[in-house]
């Protein structure tokens, strides 16, 4: 049986969050969180499979993407990690979800990790791509080897106004290039890319993205509303909730870590699952990503 998705918008803190919901509202709750530069279309097959398995699956557009909008024009268009965490927490409250499994990659994985880290009682489990997806901003000035720095060109590009103008003018070219670079063995179709590309036309996309890639290096001030949360993150606490890590083996931004390395950040690591995928494993290998979530559900 395939369960059709319903679309909705809910007031959640400073946002009106656009989302799709799959399955039965009385099912076991899951929130799937996309990364940059992707959107909810990357979870279509995962969400359908989980709904068929009895889950209540919520897939939101992050701030700056798709039909999600800021409630007030006065709210800072922040892309900082604490803002993403609060967005997820507010969404869980707004939809009345009880201890969902939260799963994500890139920006979405960061939001999921942070809520699991700072408010562990609010979630029942975590699926995180590439592990401890938490920025250590005080240490961001420490250089990496040149080969690693080269891969981060897309971040440094946005550190000046030429990059901001470039993202605004060439957002589809920029994002398509990142899809190709980060997942070299994923031969996505033009239809797959064009299904997601409209999300980058959100009026706040450029501001949120640029702020994200400046704030993480200490090059832009954060929203004062999140100062307390950012201070809590600086301590780099361990994550104690049941966790499955999905480590992609074809990702070009990072390499898989050993279980021992991951366990320095996760005290309840249920499974370390390596997957033949690049940066977007939910869309590239949906069966593996679905299985990671189901592993947490069946052990609960």
Residues of each region from the PLM?
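Flexible "cap/lid" subdomain of the alpha/beta-hydrolase fold that forms the substrate-access gate
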Residues: 2-5, 16-17, 29, 65-99, ...
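Short acidic-hydrophobic surface loop/beta-edge motif
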Residues: 6-12
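A short loop-to-beta-strand scaffold at the N-terminal edge of the catalytic core in hydrolase folds
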Residues: 12-21
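Conserved HGGG/HGGXW glycine-rich cap/lid loop of the alpha/beta-hydrolase fold
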Residues: 20-70
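Conserved acidic functional residues
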Residues: 35, 106, 283-284
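Nucleotide-sugar-dependent glycosyltransferase donor-binding/catalytic pocket residues
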Residues: 38-39, 77, 252-255, 279-282
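Hydrophobic residues on the short alpha-helix immediately C-terminal to a glycine-rich phosphate/catalytic loop
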Residues: 46, 115, 292-296
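Catalytic active-site module of serine/aspartate enzymes centered on a nucleophile-bearing elbow/loop
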Residues: 269-300
């Amino acid at each position: 049986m395939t369960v059709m998705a319903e679309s909705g918008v809910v007031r959640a803190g400073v946002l009106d969050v656009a989302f799709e919901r799959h399955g039965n509202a009385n099912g076991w709750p899951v929130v799937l969180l996309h990364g940059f530069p992707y959107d909810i279309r990357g979870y279509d097959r995962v969400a359908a499979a989980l709904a068929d398995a009895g889950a209540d699956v919520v897939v939101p557009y992050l701030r700056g993407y798709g039909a999600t909008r800021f409630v007030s024009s006065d709210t800072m268009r922040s892309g900082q990690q604490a803002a993403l965490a609060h967005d997820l927490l507010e969404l869980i409250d707004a939809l009345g979800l009880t201890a969902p499994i939260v799963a994500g990659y890139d920006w979405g994985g960061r939001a999921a990790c942070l809520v699991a880290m700072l408010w562990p009682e609010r979630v029942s489990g975590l699926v995180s791509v590439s592990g401890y997806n938490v920025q250590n901003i005080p240490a961001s000035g420490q250089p990496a080897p040149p080969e690693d720095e080269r891969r981060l060109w897309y971040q440094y590009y946005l550190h000046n106004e030429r990059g901001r103008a470039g993202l605004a003018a060439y957002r589809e070219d920029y994002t398509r290039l990142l899809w190709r670079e980060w997942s070299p063995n994923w031969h996505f179709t033009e239809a797959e890319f064009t299904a997601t590309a409209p999300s980058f036309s959100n009026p706040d996309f450029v501001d949120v993205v640029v702020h994200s890639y400046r704030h993480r290096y200490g090059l832009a001030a954060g929203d004062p509303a999140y100062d307390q949360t950012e201070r809590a993150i600086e301590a780099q606490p361990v994550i104690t909730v049941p966790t499955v890590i999905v480590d992609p083996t074809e990702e070009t931004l990072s390499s898989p870590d050993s279980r021992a390395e991951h366990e320095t950040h996760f005290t309840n690591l249920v499974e370390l699952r390596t997957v033949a995928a690049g940066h977007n494993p939910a869309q590239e290998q949906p069966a593996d990503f679905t299985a990671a979530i189901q592993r947490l559900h069946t052990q609960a």
